[in-house]
Amino acid sequence: MLSSSGHAIRRGITTSAALSNKHAFIVGAARTPIGSFRSSLSSVTAPELASVAIKAALERGAVKPSSIQEVFLGQVCQANAGQAPARQAALGAGLDLSVAVTTVNKVCSSGLKAIILAAQQIQTGHQDFAIGGGMESMSQVPFYVQRGEIPYGGFQVIDGIVKDGLTDAYDKVHMGNCGEKTSKEMGITRKDQDEYAINSYKKSAKAWENGNIGPEVVPVNVKSKKGVTIVDKDEEFTKVNFDKFTSLRTVFQKDGTITAANASTLNDGAAAVIVASQEAVSEQSLKPLARILAYGDAATHPLDFAVAPTLMFPKILERAGVKQSDVAQWEVNEAFSCVPLAFIKKLGVDPSLVNPHGGAVSIGHPIGMSGARLITHLVHTLKSGQIGVAAICNGGGGSSGMVIQKL
């Protein structure tokens, strides 16, 4: 067990602006709808979902598939997805056989870290076109049986989602218990989290109604024996029951604050972001959507993962050359409602600028995809000249963040 003493833990922070004179531009971004657990997208594999997102990002950015030189895709639960899942997605999207592909696992930060890696390849001059994104089919994550002799009394079946995605590897507790620790230490109540989550659901519904989310989404054709079903909308925000919201029992601790309603859900989806150099943008007469100003990672004690995103700021903003007051929109992943609430409380961020169109609580949290969804959403909702920030925590006490400017 790791010590929770502030003196015993080294808080690591890494940030970066451009690593050379090269700028990294986002020229295309798209995502699939997010399906509920074992629901509309459950028969589609994670690589297949990512292929759909990559194709859409290429088409919308007017980028030729043959231009892509490297791909980074996040995925957390890779068991039974087949060899090199990101490679499957790249080839499934029609990219060249010569494209270099890497699957990234930084738990919930995987999708955003993949975009950071793509940006670094552009900034250092290694590539002119790269894709960063994330994918997850939590519906298809298998159960595990330990290899070896079967003991007397049978064997235990292990849930792959819980084991590899939702359990702290050091203290052997569910991530929700870590969230409860943060809630208690920061005075974030059950009422605070319920109110936040209810607003998240309402904001997501309104955003879909007003056309704030639709433009970033590409429909997925789901084949079955009955034919083809077109899934073109997020599912999770439509399934809320506000009448039962505040009466649900807490999930992780008897006297706790986190419930099934004010936490994120298990979901399926994928997102892809195309990053290009200034030279490539000029040569192909592309219209860039945004410029990547800075990014970074931070880490603290694994039990305190919920506050890890706050450790990156204001350092990343300083590297980007902007002030906190310059940020028009903060996309902070809602693994649990206490995460954005802690972010707002610690940094003094204007709550109205945080997740204005809802977040993972109401939209869904396919864990390998979510970081890429944050950037995809910012690219499509910021107005020209505005600054946007994406921040996401991850198991093990880590986090990743990025600052972009809409062009």
From Swiss-Prot:
Keyword Lipoprotein: no
Alphabetical list of SUPFAM superfamilies matching this protein: Thiolase-like
Pfam families: Thiolase_C (PF02803), Thiolase_N (PF00108)
Residue numbers binding K(+): Y201, A260, A261, A263, V361
Binding-site positions, CoA: Y201, K244, S264
Record-linked InterPro entries: Thiolase, Thiolase-like, Thiolase_acyl_enz_int_AS, Thiolase_C, Thiolase_CS, Thiolase_N
Presence of keyword Metal-binding: yes
Major enzyme class: transferase
Gene deletion effect: Animals have a shortened lifespan and exhibit early behavioral decline characterized by the premature onset of uncoordinated locomotion and paralysis.
A GO MF term: acetyl-CoA C-acetyltransferase activity
Substitution effect: A119P: In mg368; increased uptake of the lipophilic dye Nile Red and the synthetic fatty acid analog C1-BODIPY-C12
Localization (cell): Mitochondrion
Record: transit peptide: 1-20
Catalytic machinery residues: C108 (acyl-thioester intermediate), H365 (proton acceptor), C393 (proton acceptor)
Origin: domain of life: Eukaryota
Entry keywords, A to Z: Acyltransferase, Metal-binding, Mitochondrion, Potassium, Transferase, Transit peptide
EC number annotated for this UniProt entry: 2.3.1.-
Any one of the GO CC terms: mitochondrion
Disulphide-bonded residues: none
Function: Plays a role in ketone body metabolism. Has an effect on lysosome related organelles (LRO) function, in a pathway with serotonin. Acts downstream of sir-2.1 to regulate aging and stress resistance.
UniProt family annotation: Belongs to the thiolase-like superfamily. Thiolase family.
Name recorded for this polypeptide: Acetyl-CoA acetyltransferase homolog, mitochondrial
Gene source species: Caenorhabditis elegans
Taxonomic lineage from the root: Eukaryota, Metazoa, Ecdysozoa, Nematoda, Chromadorea
Gene: kat-1
